[in-house]
């Protein structure tokens, strides 16, 4: 708690308060030569309001992307700066490429495929096969994370629950992910007006 207060606490100018605080702690400890270790508490219990509608999910992901952008811009001095260790050399680069810029890469890729299809420059059977492999592989990754979490908290699932999880993972990869990629790609439109907007989620 003392370190959080000394580092400046939560920044009221951001809406991604959790990530911003963690990065701020890294920067503060590095700049002040304070030995530290930030770990993930697997047994921590916290409650959050999960969106139940697609519109609310889009608001949440838009807020997350804006919060990510704000945090990375505030701490851009650590980018590839060896003074900040692996956080600046690897973690920042990861979040820049695979989180902040990835929706733009995804949307560009989709538009490229549509254009190639329109001008008959695409091998349709190969594209379908490739997309199928992508869906199966991504669904397996999601299911692995899901079942690992189920195992660690010792929850019991029925066979129907397992089938639902498999179906939802396939839908998430093949449909929902594309929708959320568009939401994230357009999140910064009107940024000045919405940079402090939390976005209300219906209970």
Residue ranges and their predicted role:
Residues 1-85, 93, 97, 202:
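Non-transmembrane catalytic domains and loops of membrane-associated enzymes and transporters
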Residues 3, 121-122, 195-196:
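Residue-level recognition of short, well-ordered coil/turn positions
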Residues 12, 42, 136-139, 193, ...:
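Intrinsically disordered, low-complexity regions enriched in small/polar residues
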Residues 56, 60-74, 165-203:
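Membrane-proximal soluble regions of multi-pass membrane proteins
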Residues 84-87, 120:
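Membrane-helix boundary/interface segments in integral membrane proteins
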Residues 94-192:
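Membrane-embedded multi-pass helical conduit in multi-pass membrane proteins
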């Amino acid at each position: 708690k003392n370190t959080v207060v000394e580092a400046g606490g939560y920044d009221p100018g951001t809406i991604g308060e959790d990530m911003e605080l963690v990065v701020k702690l890294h920067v503060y400890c590095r700049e002040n030569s304070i030995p530290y270790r930030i770990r993930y508490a697997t047994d921590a219990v916290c409650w959050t309001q999960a969106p139940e509608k697609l519109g609310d999910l889009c608001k949440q992901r838009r807020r997350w992307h804006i919060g990510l952008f704000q945090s990375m811009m505030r701490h851009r001095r650590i980018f590839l700066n060896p003074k900040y260790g692996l956080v600046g050399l690897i973690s920042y680069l990861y979040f820049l490429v695979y989180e902040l810029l990835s929706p733009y890469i995804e949307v560009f890729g989709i538009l490229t495929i549509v254009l190639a299809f329109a001008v008959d420059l695409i091998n349709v059977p190969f594209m379908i096969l490739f997309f199928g492999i992508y869906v199966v592989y991504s669904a397996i990754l999601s299911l692995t994370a899901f079942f690992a979490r189920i195992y660690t908290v010792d929850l019991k699932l029925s066979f129907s629950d397992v089938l639902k999880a498999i179906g939802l993972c396939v839908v998430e990869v093949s449909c929902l992910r594309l929708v959320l990629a568009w939401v994230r790609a357009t999140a910064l439109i009107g940024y000045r007006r919405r940079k402090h907007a939390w976005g209300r989620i219906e209970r």
